[in-house]
Amino acid sequence: MVSLFGILNIGSRGISASQASLDTTANNIANANTEGYSRQRTVQQTLDPLVTANGVFGQGVNVVTVERIRNRLLEAQVREALGDTNFNQQMGTILAQLESIFSDPLHSVSSTTETLYAGGLNDLISSFFRAFQDLSTTPDSPELRVAAIESAQALAESIVSKSQQLITLRMELNQQIGTQVQTINQALQEIAGLNGAIRSVEAGGNRNANELRDRRDLLLRQISELVPVQVEEGSEGMVRVSIAGQWIVDHTSANPLVVETSRNEDGIDLVGIRIGGQGLHLIDNEVRKGKLGAILEARDRLLPALSEELDVLARGVIFEVNRLHSASSGLVGYSAIRSSLDVPSRALDSNSTMTLNRVFNEPAPGSRSATGNRPYPIQDGEFTIRVADSGYQKQDTYSVKVHTDDTLAALVSRIDRADG
């Protein structure tokens, strides 16, 4: 049978348990708008009963601990979703920048006859070919010649401008990589410190470091917004964090990311990411989520592809214009023409065995061009030479065949023999 003193103790313990629950509820209300805060609740447990000859009597209630209401599986899914969401948002921002580059507003280009209006590349290309089409109908018109030249200049300047803007955007993305890596490293250091603090607090048994765990989970979320991470929690409450299978937090030790910068032959900075002292480099294939993943995807894949497309466009326009231009004549004839491209002097030696393919197509030392020293590869075919007198009253036409295995001296000799 419970004594009066026992009854008072049971009541006291009940009041204390209720007070603890009220305190926990008040704390929940106070932190309702606190970022990363997890709602808490008291865990109550009945005390061991008093066993007597007259029966078994309860001894009241006791608060065992205060725990967070948190689901680890859902937390991992949230981190996964944050990576996807922020990847798409960052990529959307980058695509908007690219849209502004390639969909520029209307701007004026001065002309001797009129003001031409051009928008994006499509409009400029259309204006360019329209100007040459007009010129083809009246080739001796000075006004149309000026208009054709100006449309060509506008197109060339636009392509160069867009190419430079892509380089500038790449540099901006490199800077963002450095900034985000710094943010990640700061979070990693704090997580490693929180691991040690959580272990110390919870080493006493039923104590839960709820606020410390909330802070750590918030940091893990923030990192997941930037880069995909995998999280494992051990028996002591400490977590290990990895990227692409490599640890960046191992209990109380952080293994920070390192930004490495080099410069290529074109003077463009190349920024890479390495994991701490392990010398392991991260590439975009390993980081396909988060803002950092979007930046790497855009910098290493999207921008180079767009730059290459611009180069292909420029080469195509240049090739076609030069092809048509080479078959035409100017208002004033030439008595001599000097090429802007040079060849090795030894290739002109009559005893030289250097073929045209080697002279024109093989890359020079240090060259990265797939077509060697020239913008276009030489191919088997023929070209036409037209010779006219000073008044254009008489013109002779000669065709000269070209083979890639010819020597330059042989080609010169073939040209000399063309007129018989």
Feature map (PLM): residue ranges:
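Structural signature of extracellular appendage/secretion-system components
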Residues: 1-420
